[in-house]
Amino acid sequence: MNRSLLAFAIVLVLLVAGTSSQLFNKSGNCPMRNTVTSCTPRCIGDGECSSNQKCCPNKCGTTSCANSSPLNTGSDGGYKGSSNQQAVYCNGVKCAAYEKCQYDRNTRRDKCTRV
């Protein structure tokens, strides 16, 4: 009985440790999506990235580890607009309040488009 309880406790601790590392949120801001050109390694949370990196949206439409930015580009790194009232930047251009940053497949560039 004691061995099974000990085994259960160990599994529970490992599960909690693994989950908390994925949910751990590091300080700093994600850079703008179009500046994160590395699409690998993919990540789910900041805990998967090395010491000074965050898990951020990238140019490929997924998330990968990137160096944090001193600028606040919104909670999503300027990715496809932001639900809050913060400005969204697209290719270094500030989008209007009714626009979002979206990848244009024809020009292969990000551009501001209406929401």
Curated annotation (Swiss-Prot):
<keyword id="KW-0929">Antimicrobial</keyword>
<keyword id="KW-0732">Signal</keyword>
<keyword id="KW-0295">Fungicide</keyword>
<feature type="disulfide bond">
    <location>
        <begin position="43"/>
        <end position="55"/>
    </location>
</feature>
<comment type="similarity">
    <text>Belongs to the venom waprin family. Cys-rich waprin subfamily.</text>
</comment>
<feature type="disulfide bond">
    <location>
        <begin position="30"/>
        <end position="56"/>
    </location>
</feature>
<keyword id="KW-0722">Serine protease inhibitor</keyword>
<feature type="disulfide bond">
    <location>
        <begin position="49"/>
        <end position="65"/>
    </location>
</feature>
<dbReference type="Pfam" id="PF00095">
    <property type="entry name" value="WAP"/>
</dbReference>
<feature type="domain" description="WAP">
    <location>
        <begin position="23"/>
        <end position="69"/>
    </location>
</feature>
<protein>
    <recommendedName>
        <fullName>Waprin-like protein</fullName>
    </recommendedName>
</protein>
<keyword id="KW-1015">Disulfide bond</keyword>
<dbReference type="GO" id="GO:0004867">
    <property type="term" value="F:serine-type endopeptidase inhibitor activity"/>
</dbReference>
<dbReference type="InterPro" id="IPR008197">
    <property type="entry name" value="WAP_dom"/>
</dbReference>
<feature type="disulfide bond">
    <location>
        <begin position="39"/>
        <end position="60"/>
    </location>
</feature>
<comment type="function">
    <text>Antimicrobial peptides with activity against Gram-positive and Gram-negative bacteria as well as fungi. Recognizes carbohydrates in the microbial cell walls, and induces structural damage to them. Also inhibits microbial serine proteases, as well as mammalian elastases. Carbohydrates that are recognized are LPS, mannan, peptidoglycan, and N-acetl-D-glucosamine.</text>
</comment>
<feature type="signal peptide">
    <location>
        <begin position="1"/>
        <end position="21"/>
    </location>
</feature>
<dbReference type="GO" id="GO:0050832">
    <property type="term" value="P:defense response to fungus"/>
</dbReference>
<keyword id="KW-0964">Secreted</keyword>
<dbReference type="GO" id="GO:0031640">
    <property type="term" value="P:killing of cells of another organism"/>
</dbReference>
<keyword id="KW-0044">Antibiotic</keyword>
<dbReference type="InterPro" id="IPR036645">
    <property type="entry name" value="Elafin-like_sf"/>
</dbReference>
<dbReference type="GO" id="GO:0005576">
    <property type="term" value="C:extracellular region"/>
</dbReference>
<dbReference type="GO" id="GO:0042742">
    <property type="term" value="P:defense response to bacterium"/>
</dbReference>
<keyword id="KW-0646">Protease inhibitor</keyword>
